[in-house]
């Protein structure tokens, strides 16, 4: 007899049998879901992803991919403190997600206006004893990062991190070994083949077609910097903290960052700034990047000579360079005098300090307010050497005080900045590089820096040293570093005499800005070549450097805007630097021949008829209308934004004195205000006014060889309204028509040029106006054949349409000086120096009375500048 149990009883029995199986399976499924997390960039189909994994032993690893390729293999992460070891035995608690978008502006760098977007995931874990660890992961479309957050309160000691990066052992690597002041030499190797050592950050790795630049950012005195520790044969690089860390909770550690993608994406990355703390300086109007004349490298003893430093000030004034750095050796007895001397010439002074003189709060309270009272614009602080927590706390104090005093800062002999320039924007430069002062063969070395050190922050390389004989680079390579290397204070390290012996180099250096609106990598490879395009306003500069054999570089110009552009290239020629121009469009290709270990710079600016240079030329002085004979005037010497500029009798006052800046602005009141198209409008009749300089398109002006002053944004010319010629006629922009109401001359030097040695004037014999006529010395008589004007374009003209020139554009001593039809060549460009010499920009030599003659009829020539009485002229 069989017994059939009731159906309900069978169901209960089956449930009892299956339930334990369910209890086993479900927790296993939950654990699997919780042990791996992926964070992708914010855009649809983002190519970048970060992966965090919790392993069976409670350890964490971090990995990253780009375009579907694993770039950073799983590597240990975690942190150890005096309270807990948060590198192992971790248990997952929870996950939270958000999207982070930011816009911010930098005062320096490869791109002043920044926009960034990240996906952020916070993964919370508990460790032994219930200690809490949050791992915050961010992914953008071009990089990944993570940091640790430790909640709680009270003090804690950080004893180490497990943070590391792993790449294939065969990956190409570019590393810099530890060296005092971060001045080691970058070298190429493989990730596994690098010697056992610690290495500075950043470090660059190539994995297939992808690159990863690993670094850290958002570092201050709450923590310490780290090196990358590596064992030969391993492909893992682990963070090794510089000294002990005692800090307080809650704690957010610095970000461990990796810029990912192709070489252009990594080079153009701003991840170090994007993840740094926002600016602590609300008003940054006083922070002004610029070109600096610096004497120490070319003549070590010169900073102790006030007289020599004044010569550097004069040089900076002549060339529109904004700053002079007085290095070790200055004396407080004469610094106030030279600051006043420089200020009167539109030049600002930077002073060098040994960090030991600013080590304590008392020392800083003594010196920093003092130099501010002297009128010094900023300080260069040297010999800092390391980034331990006590040193970072010293940085915090210095940065807060210099911001409060409105002193700009350059840290020299320093470790690599790690986000400092965003948080403290008065830091316009930092060294942390094996720069020009090392006097080494460095063509290949130079081509690594744009992809590594200079990605992270502004780099004070002190470039462009022609007089250095122990180098393997050409002159054009030296010149090109002024564009390829970025620094908010670009310290050009040669002497005035050396630069003025290279006029083609000054053609570029005199117009370069020190901060950029946009940067693009056009091509290159670390250790071989680097080609970058940088934009400021409406003009571009392409700089290229190479190592190895001669080559021809070609690149499409598709990044240009519409219309015609003047491409002005300076490169190596058979007899030194050579200059060539070409009119191009964005459909053309730039092609430049490079010498071995050579380079080039190409300036690209909107083209107007007759242009042959992009250089904003001319000295400070009045703009005089050729039709009216009146000068561009700010009525009533007003400094109020929006005051419309008008014609008025020329009086030589500050409200009629205009200076062409290196970035194409026309400034008045020593650079305090700019000539501005009202509202940035482009229509005929738009008022031209003064306004705070803001680098906008409405403040850009290009000078044509015909004397027109063109706003490239509108394509319109500076114009006297209604063709007026009476005082009070307002100025506007109008369609360029070549009329006399659109033609301007620099009116700061009308009249005769009288020789100091002879007492006689520069004269055209018999009033001869024919091209080729040679001027001579003659008794001063005030005639039109002795009346010379300095044009906006830098020419010395006579009879309105003849220019003083070096015959045939020659540059040798003894070259005849003559008049010729004005053609905007450098043989017709002259600069009147403060010592009374008149320098030809094509040759760098001086207007000279032949054989030091003083008699009537003595002819003029070019000759090496020597300051003799036959080369000194006064204007009357």
What are these regions (language model features)?
Residues 123, 497-541, 573-581:
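Glycan-recognition and catalytic regions of carbohydrate-active enzymes
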Residues 251-323:
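An acidic-aromatic substrate-binding cleft motif
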Residues 614-641, 654-682, 697-725, 740-769, ...:
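Extracellular glycan-recognition/adhesion modules and their associated mucin-like linkers
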Residues 329-474:
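Aromatic- and carboxylate-enriched substrate-binding clefts and catalytic-loop regions
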Residues 34-275, 577:
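N-terminal accessory beta-strand-rich subdomains and adjacent acidic, glycine-rich linkers
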Residues 1-33:
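Secretory targeting and sorting signals
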Residues 583-614:
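C-terminal beta-strand-rich structural cap/linker in extracellular carbohydrate-active enzymes
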Residues 525-563, 600-603:
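Carbohydrate-binding surface patches
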């Amino acid at each position: 007899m069989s017994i059939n149990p009731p159906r309900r009883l069978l169901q209960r029995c089956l449930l009892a049998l299956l339930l334990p199986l369910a209890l086993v399976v479900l927790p296993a499924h939950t654990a699997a879901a919780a042990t791996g997390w992926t964070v992708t960039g914010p855009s649809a189909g983002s190519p970048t992803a970060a992966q965090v994994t919790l392993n069976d032993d409670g350890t964490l690893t971090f990995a990253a991919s780009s375009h579907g390729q694993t770039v950073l293999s799983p590597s240990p992460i975690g942190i150890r403190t005096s309270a807990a070891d948060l590198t192992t035995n971790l248990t997952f608690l929870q996950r939270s997600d958000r999207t982070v978008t930011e816009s911010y502006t930098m005062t320096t760098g490869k791109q002043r206006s920044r926009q960034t977007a990240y996906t952020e995931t916070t993964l919370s874990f508990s460790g032994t004893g219930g200690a809490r660890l949050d791992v915050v992961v961010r992914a953008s479309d071009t990089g990944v990062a993570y940091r640790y957050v430790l909640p709680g309160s009270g003090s804690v000691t950080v004893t180490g991190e497990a943070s590391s990066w792993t790449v294939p052992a065969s990956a190409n690597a570019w590393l810099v070994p530890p060296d005092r002041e971060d001045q080691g030499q970058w070298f190429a190797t493989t990730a596994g083949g690098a010697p056992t050592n610690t290495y500075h950050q950043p470090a660059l790795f190539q994995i297939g077609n992808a690159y990863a630049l690993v670094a850290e950012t958002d570092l201050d005195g709450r923590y310490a910097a780290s090196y990358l520790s590596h064992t030969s044969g391993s492909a893992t690089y682990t963070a090794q903290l510089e000294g002990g860390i005692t800090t307080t909770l809650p704690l957010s550690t610095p970000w461990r960052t990796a810029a990912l993608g192709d070489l252009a994406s990594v080079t153009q990355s701003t991840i170090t700034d994007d993840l740094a703390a926002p600016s602590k300086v609300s008003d940054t109007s006083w922070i002004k990047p610029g070109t600096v004349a610096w004497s120490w490298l070319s003549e070590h003893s010169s900073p102790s000579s006030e007289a020599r430093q004044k010569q550097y000030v004069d040089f900076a004034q002549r060339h529109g360079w904004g700053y002079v750095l007085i290095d070790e050796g200055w004396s407080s007895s004469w610094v106030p005098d030279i600051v006043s001397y420089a200020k009167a010439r539109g030049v600002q002074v930077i002073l060098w300090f040994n960090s030991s003189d600013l080590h304590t709060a008392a020392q800083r309270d003594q010196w920093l307010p003092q130099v501010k009272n002297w009128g010094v614009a900023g300080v260069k602080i040297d010999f800092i050497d390391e980034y331990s927590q006590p040193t970072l706390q010293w940085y915090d104090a210095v940065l807060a005080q210099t911001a409060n005093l409105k002193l700009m800062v350059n840290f020299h002999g320093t470790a690599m900045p790690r986000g400092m320039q965003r948080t403290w924007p008065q830091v316009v430069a930092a060294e942390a590089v094996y720069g020009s002062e090392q006097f080494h063969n460095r063509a290949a070395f130079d081509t690594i820096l744009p992809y590594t050190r200079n990605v992270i922050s502004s780099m004070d390389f002190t470039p462009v040293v022609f007089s250095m004989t122990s180098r393997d680079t050409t002159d054009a390579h030296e010149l090109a570093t002024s564009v390829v290397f970025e620094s908010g204070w670009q310290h050009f390290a040669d002497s005035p005499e050396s630069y003025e012996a290279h006029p083609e180099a000054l053609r570029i250096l005199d117009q370069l800005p020190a901060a950029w609106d946009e940067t693009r990598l056009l091509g290159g490879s670390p250790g071989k070549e680097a080609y970058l395009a940088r934009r400021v306003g409406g003009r571009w500069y392409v700089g290229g450097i190479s190592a190895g054999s001669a080559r021809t570089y070609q690149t499409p110009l598709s990044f240009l805007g519409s219309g015609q552009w003047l491409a002005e290239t300076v490169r190596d020629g058979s007899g030194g630097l050579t200059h060539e121009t070409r009119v191009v469009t964005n459909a053309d290709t730039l092609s430049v021949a490079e010498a071995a270990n050579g380079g080039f710079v190409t300036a690209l600016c909107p083209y107007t008829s007759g242009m042959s240079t992009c250089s904003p030329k001319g000295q400070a002085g009045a703009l005089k209308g050729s039709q009216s004979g009146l000068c561009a005037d700010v009525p009533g010497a007003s400094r109020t934004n929006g005051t419309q500029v008008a014609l008025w009798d020329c009086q030589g006052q500050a409200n009629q004195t205009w200076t062409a800046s290196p970035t194409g602005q026309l400034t008045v009141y020593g650079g305090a205000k700019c000539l501005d198209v009202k509202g940035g409008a482009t229509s005929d009749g738009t008022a031209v006014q003064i306004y705070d300089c803001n680098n906008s398109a409405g403040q850009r002006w290009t000078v044509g060889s015909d004397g027109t002053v063109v706003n490239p944004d509108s394509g319109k010319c500076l114009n006297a309204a209604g063709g007026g010629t009476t005082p009070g006629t307002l100025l506007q922009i109008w369609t360029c028509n070549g009329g006399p109401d659109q033609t301007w001359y620099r009116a700061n030097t009308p009249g005769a040029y009288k020789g100091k040695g002879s007492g006689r004037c520069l004269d055209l014999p018999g009033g001869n106006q024919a091209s080729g006529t040679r001027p001579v010395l003659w008794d001063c008589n005030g005639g039109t054949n002795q009346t010379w004007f300095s044009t906006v374009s830098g020419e010395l003209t006579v009879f309105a349409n003849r220019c003083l020139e070096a015959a045939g554009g020659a540059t040798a001593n003894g070259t005849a000086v003559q008049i010729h039809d004005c053609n905007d060549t450098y043989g017709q460009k002259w600069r009147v120096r403060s010592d009374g010499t008149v320098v030809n920009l094509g040759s760098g030599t001086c207007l000279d009375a032949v054989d030091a003659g003083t008699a009537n009829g003595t002819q003029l020539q070019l000759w090496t500048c020597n300051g003799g009485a036959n080369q000194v002229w006064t204007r009357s």
